Amino acid sequence: MGIGYGASDEQLEKQIGCVKYTLFCFNIVAWMISTALFALTVWLRAEPGFNDWLRILEAQSFYIGVYVLIGISIVMMAVSFLGCLSALMENTLALFVFVGTQVFGFIAIVAGSAVLLQFSTINSSLQPLLNVSLRGFVATSEYTYSNYVLTMIQENIGCCGATGPWDYLDLRQPLPSSCRDTVSGNAFFNGCVDELTWFFEGKTGWIVALAMTLGLLNVICAVMSFVLVQAVKKEEEQASNYRR
């Protein structure tokens, strides 16, 4: 009887050790991803040219999702240390707190990513904002500032008007040279709303992918922490029965 119990106890101890150190490694990876997410989101927020374009086009609501992801990446960097400590100490209370933070982190990451995509993809809330701003610039393209903004965007992105060259015709404005391909001389077919949206998608794609990877790690860490809690409780029960 004693031999059987000892073998079972040893097997449980090995299982706890396996889960504990696997959870520790996952937390290290989560910390690295959180750090990378923080760096990318801060870089996106601080990039001068990108920031200027959003300010000029009055589309700074794009940054709402970025702010959410900056905040959650900071929280997740700190929480990863809590996860490492709670796993190594096998403290059930700390592990339950850690599970709660992982659930919160997952929800916040999904929300932040959803908001960021809502303001950076085709058919998103960003496009009506860009359309209003760009049509306003086209309607007043005879003024120096409007002409400067349109030239900057159309030459750099390779687009024309808000939805296409017909915007200038609809608003009775001459088609500027910045709307034409320098090689063929033909007007760019695509409007700047779609081209800018594709440009923003390229900027945010990696960030959202990284954020969702972190969210997946949150789920894995939460499940493993719960498994570790149950294993530690079982070990404590076995130890209590053995003492009796």
Curated annotation (Swiss-Prot):
| UniProt main location, coarse | membrane
- One short Pfam name that applies is Tetraspanin
Q: Which residues cross the membrane?
A: 23-43, 62-82, 92-112, 207-227
Q: What does this protein do?
A: Required for assembly of smooth septate junctions (sSJs), together with Ssk and mesh. Important for barrier function of the midgut epithelium.
Protein name as it appears in the record? Tetraspanin-2A
For side Cytoplasmic, which residue ranges?
1-22, 83-91, 228-244
Segments on the Extracellular face:
44-61, 113-206
Q: Which family does it belong to?
A: Belongs to the tetraspanin (TM4SF) family.
Q: Which residues form a coiled coil?
A: none
Q: Any keyword Metal-binding?
A: no
Q: Which SUPFAM superfamilies match?
A: Tetraspanin
